[in-house]
Structures are given as C-alpha cells and as structure tokens.
Swiss-Prot record:
Late-budding domains (L domains) are short sequence motifs essential for viral particle budding. They recruit proteins of the host ESCRT machinery (Endosomal Sorting Complex Required for Transport) or ESCRT-associated proteins. VP40 contains one L domain: a PPXY motif which potentially interacts with the WW domain 3 of NEDD4 E3 ubiquitin ligase and the three WW domains of SMURF2 E3 ubiquitin ligase. Most abundant protein in the virion. GO terms for molecular function: structural constituent of virion. The keyword Protein biosynthesis does not apply. It comes from the Viruses. The lineage of its organism: Viruses, Riboviria, Orthornavirae, Negarnaviricota, Haploviricotina. It holds the Pfam family Matrix_Filo. Keywords: Host cell membrane, Host endosome, Host membrane, Host-virus interaction, Inhibition of host innate immune response by virus, Inhibition of host interferon signaling pathway by virus, Inhibition of host JAK1 by virus, Interferon antiviral system evasion, Membrane, Viral budding, Viral budding via the host ESCRT complexes, Viral immunoevasion, Viral matrix protein, Viral release from host cell, Virion. A motif (PPXY motif) lies at residues 16-19. Belongs to the filoviridae matrix protein VP40 family. This is Matrix protein VP40.
C-alpha cells in the first residue's frame, strides 16, 4: 500500500523502543546490564582499506553473535546464533576505515526487553558514540532488533537471560553495480520512494521512477509512490552468491532513472539495489509490500 504520509515503518527503524530511561546518544553503563561483561568482536569480510579513498564504494555491516540463553526454570541453551544487521553505507557517508575501527574497538553486550508486548533483543556498544554516523550502532551506542527476526524462532516464546559468548563483525563489499543515492542527496534532505520489508529493518531506497512510468500511474498527491506500487509485481529478489544475508533487486531499466545514483560501471543496463535481510527471506517478489518515503541518510528524522 502506498502512502505519502505514512512514516511509521521508517520511524520504527530510526527510533526503536527505548531501553529503560536511556535516550539517543546516551550509552548504557556496563553495571546496568545484568552484570554482563562486554565482548570485543573478531572480524571477517571483504575489507580493503584502499577502498576508503573511493567515494562510490558501498559496504554492508553485520554483527554475527553466538549467545547462551538461560530461561527461567529451564537449563541453559548454549551456542545460539544471532544475526544483527547494522546497515549498508557508502564512503560518501562516512570513511570506511573509521567505521571499521570504531566497530572493532567497541565492547558489546546483549540484553532482552519487552515493549508493547513485543520481545526485543538490544545490542549495546559500550564506549563513545559518533552522533552523526549513518550506522545506528555507532551513532547512538545501542540498537534494538525484534527477537524472532534475529535469533531462531524456537527461542522466542519465553523470557531469557542472554550471555554473549562470541561476536564477529562481517563487512561485505557490495558489487560494482550497486546503486546508491548520490552524494548531494545523502547530505541533503531529499526523500526517496522505498519499499518496506520489515518494521525493524530500514526501507529499501529505490531510484526515482522515469517520467513515462510516473504518467502511467499519475496522481496529484502521491503519484511517484503509486508508480512504484504499480510495478512492484515486476521486481524480483535474488540472493547474492557467497554473501551472508545480502540480497539484490535488478530494476527494469525502462522504468527507473539512475542519473542520481552512484554507478561504477557506466555500461550497466539497469540499476541494482542491495539490501540486508535474514537468510530465509522469501524470493517471490514484493507484492503487497508497503511503499513509503524514506531518507537515504538514516541520521535524518522524518517530518
């Protein structure tokens, strides 16, 4: 469903439920986290620091955790995997080397809380935050994930105590055909059409539809969004080979404009949009997904 005024999905990503009384840019002290000790992550991935000097290079950042779960009146279940997507970012938004250094030198804990009847996993980074950083984890020091999205569903029925036993930072370089909004759009306040795939994942920002596609679904109020909605059934999702939890959408070249996007290969016939999602994300397209307006830069707040 398209809506030019519905920002709820995007705002849930920007502002997940609060942890106790701590707000934005207030990092949670270690002594308030059930006496847990922070753990420093290891590293895996496609890191080439020469890329930090190339503004149009994008990377996907993910924390992969191993946790021990202790349920009340039940024995501890050890070695439960957790998938914690931090987001996709280009060098236009923040230098790659600084981002990786800040993530690797941080100390992390993991807790659980309930908000409006929904169970969340909260990952907390102990240390100094970077207020303007595009990744929420570095910007505000903590990030909430809906529990049944990031850990196996059979562990989501009761209240648990978590003990973080291993943490890996995965940095994956996006292929050269990746489309991202251009630098002036990232640092400005332009909103883009986007597809919402989950209330606790950022919307997938899309290029602007071409004029002929817009005319086919013209509406004086929210024509661009209706134009996107009218062609969602033509979009197909593909799993990116040899990448973890990374997917792509090849957009029809005759319907989408790429002039405002970052494209390393000028010969590409159509824009390709990459996004993070759980490994079991369905590949049968985007029918019935909500179309919203979203900022490319997640440090901005919706009006």
């Amino acid at each position: 469903m398209a809506s030019s005024s519905n920002y709820n999905t995007y705002m849930q990503y920007l502002n997940p439920p609060p942890y106790a009384d701590h707000g934005a840019n207030q990092l949670i002290p270690a002594d308030q986290l059930s006496n847990q000790h922070g753990i420093t992550p290891n590293y895996v991935g496609d890191l080439n620091l020469d890329d930090q000097f190339k503004g149009n290079v994008c990377h996907a950042f993910t924390l992969e955790a191993i946790i021990d779960i202790s349920a009340y009146n039940e024995r501890t279940v050890k070695g439960v995997p957790a998938w914690l997507p931090l987001g996709i970012m280009s060098n236009f938004e923040y230098p790659l080397a600084h981002t990786v250094a800040a993530l690797l030198t941080g100390s992390y804990t993991i807790t659980q809380f309930t908000h409006n009847g929904q169970k969340f996993v909260r990952v907390n980074r102990l240390g100094t935050g970077i207020p303007a950083h595009p990744l929420r984890m570095l910007r505000e020091g903590n990030q909430a994930f809906i529990q049944n999205m990031v850990i196996p569903r059979n562990f989501s029925t009761n209240q648990f105590t978590y003990n973080l036993t291993n943490l890996v930072l995965s940095v994956q370089k996006l292929p050269d055909d990746a489309w991202r909004p251009s630098k002036d759009k990232l640092i400005g306040n332009t909103m883009h059409p986007a597809v919402s795939i989950h209330p606790n994942l950022p919307p997938i920002v899309l290029p602007t539809v071409k004029k002929q596609a817009y005319r086919q679904h013209k509406n004086p109020n929210n024509g661009p969004l209706l134009a996107i909605s009218g062609i969602l059934h033509q979009l197909r999702v593909e799993k990116v080979p040899e990448k973890t939890s990374l997917f792509r959408i090849s957009l029809p070249a005759d319907m989408f404009s790429v002039k405002e996007g970052m494209m390393k290969k000028r010969g590409e016939s159509s824009p390709v949009v990459y996004f993070q999602a759980p490994e079991n994300f369905p590949l049968n397209g985007f029918n019935n997904r909500q179309v919203v307006l979203a900022y490319a830069n997640p440090t901005l707040s919706a009006i």
